[in-house]
């Protein structure tokens, strides 16, 4: 087995790249037809998502103003408000960034924006995923332990605050690992291509593998697992209540009204989990495939590659339709 390069060799290689290395002009990436279609669809979904989420936010604000003066927003609507804000953040950062980057192909915004926008991109991806977890946990507690949740009214606010904090902290490494590299023409003198990448930010290959796995787990695996567990608990509780003796069920309805008023909770949380799974699975399947087999991009057709990535942009479009239908 061949020995891996020493840290000194890696450092020299990275220094050569940062000082501009020769690159054949024919090897430079270009905006293909499928790339143009991706850009068009991306900006269409951007307008759609921005309209849906902003409209729901305004509708929620108008609904709040109609309430009695000084009355606080209900816990569920507070959670939906933060999920809408998180989706709006993802819409306003990730979609335009992806669209413009596909148009320009290379990075023209400089080192500072390379780091800052990479941080904001991941932050705005963490936030909706964590808010979905908060809503799933809250709805599960509302069904399985309603009295305990009602006695502690600050649980929802605490989980929301924690979700925003974790999103900010977990995205922090982006400020360090992303950097500019410059590639030169065959003479090695004139810079012909610049890109914002993580190249040479990790001293060992497994450091990057660990970071990729951590990010993948926090963005997809862990939120999906928690949502599935919460949905399973809700289904189990509602099924048990619905199969009670009719006389006993009538008595229970006067206490918690689970069968009628909270049945839509199950439908909404299942719809959230389904939307999350359907929209993000193709994106992460492609990412994992590339992680284990970088050459797959040479075998996978360009249209299929772009199509898989576009799936992720559907999630912030679907969410306002789901919680708008079930909550208002």
From Swiss-Prot:
Pfam families: 7tm_1. Disulfide bonds join 114-196. Residues 59-77, 138-164, 233-281, 327-328 are cytoplasmic. Coiled coil: none annotated. The chain crosses the membrane at residues 39-58, 78-97, 116-137, 165-184, 213-232, 282-300, 307-326. InterPro entries: GPCR_Rhodpsn (IPR000276), GPCR_Rhodpsn_7TM (IPR017452), GphnRH_fam_rcpt (IPR001658). The keyword Acyltransferase does not apply. Changing residue 217 to R: In HH7; altered hormone binding. GO terms for cellular component: membrane; plasma membrane. Changing residue 262 to Q: In HH7; uncertain significance; some patients also carry mutations in FGFR1; minimal effects upon receptor affinity but expression decreased; altered activation of phospholipase C. It is a multi-pass membrane protein. GO terms for molecular function: gonadotropin-releasing hormone receptor activity. One of its GO terms (biological process) is cellular response to hormone stimulus. Residues 1-38, 98-115, 185-212, 301-306 are extracellular. The keyword Amino-acid biosynthesis does not apply. It comes from the Eukaryota. Receptor for gonadotropin releasing hormone (GnRH) that mediates the action of GnRH to stimulate the secretion of the gonadotropic hormones luteinizing hormone (LH) and follicle-stimulating hormone (FSH). This receptor mediates its action by association with G-proteins that activate a phosphatidylinositol-calcium second messenger system. Isoform 2 may act as an inhibitor of GnRH-R signaling. It is linked to Hypogonadotropic hypogonadism 7 with or without anosmia: A disorder characterized by absent or incomplete sexual maturation by the age of 18 years, in conjunction with low levels of circulating gonadotropins and testosterone and no other abnormalities of the hypothalamic-pituitary axis. In some cases, it is associated with non-reproductive phenotypes, such as anosmia, cleft palate, and sensorineural hearing loss. Anosmia or hyposmia is related to the absence or hypoplasia of the olfactory bulbs and tracts. This is Gonadotropin-releasing hormone receptor. The lineage of its organism: Eukaryota, Metazoa, Chordata, Craniata, Vertebrata.
């Amino acid at each position: 087995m061949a020995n891996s390069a020493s840290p000194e060799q890696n450092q020299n290689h990275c220094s050569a790249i940062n000082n501009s290395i020769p690159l054949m002009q024919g090897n430079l990436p270009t905006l293909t037809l499928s790339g143009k279609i991706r850009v068009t669809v991306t900006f269409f979904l951007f307008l759609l998502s921005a309209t849906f989420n902003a409209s729901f936010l305004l509708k929620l604000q108008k609904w709040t103003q109609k309430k009695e003066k000084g009355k606080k927003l209900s816990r569920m609507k507070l959670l939906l408000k933060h999920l809408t804000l998180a989706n709006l953040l993802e819409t306003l950062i990730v979609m335009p960034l992806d669209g413009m980057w596909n148009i320009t192909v290379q990075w023209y915004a400089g080192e500072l924006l390379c780091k800052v926008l990479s941080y904001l991109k991941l932050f705005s991806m963490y936030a909706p995923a964590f808010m979905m977890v908060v809503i799933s946990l809250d709805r599960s507690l509302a069904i399985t332990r309603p009295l305990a949740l009602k006695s502690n009214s600050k649980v929802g606010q605490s989980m929301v605050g924690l979700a925003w904090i974790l999103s900010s902290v977990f995205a922090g490494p982006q400020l360090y690992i992303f950097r500019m590299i410059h590639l030169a023409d065959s003479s090695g003198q004139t810079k012909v291509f610049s890109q914002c990448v993580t190249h040479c930010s990790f001293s060992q290959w497994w450091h990057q593998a660990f970071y990729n796995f951590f990010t993948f787990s926090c963005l997809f695996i862990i939120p999906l697992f928690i949502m599935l567990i919460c949905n399973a608990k809700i289904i189990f509780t509602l099924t048990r209540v619905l199969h009670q003796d009719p006389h006993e069920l009538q008595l229970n309805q006067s206490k918690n009204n689970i069968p009628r008023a909270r049945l839509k909770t199950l439908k909404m949380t299942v719809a959230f989990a389904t939307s999350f799974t359907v929209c993000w699975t193709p994106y992460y399947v492609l990412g994992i495939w590339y992680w284990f087999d970088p050459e797959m991009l040479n075998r996978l057709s360009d249209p299929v590659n772009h199509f898989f990535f576009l799936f992720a942009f559907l999630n912030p479009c679907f969410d306002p339709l789901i919680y708008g239908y079930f909550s208002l």
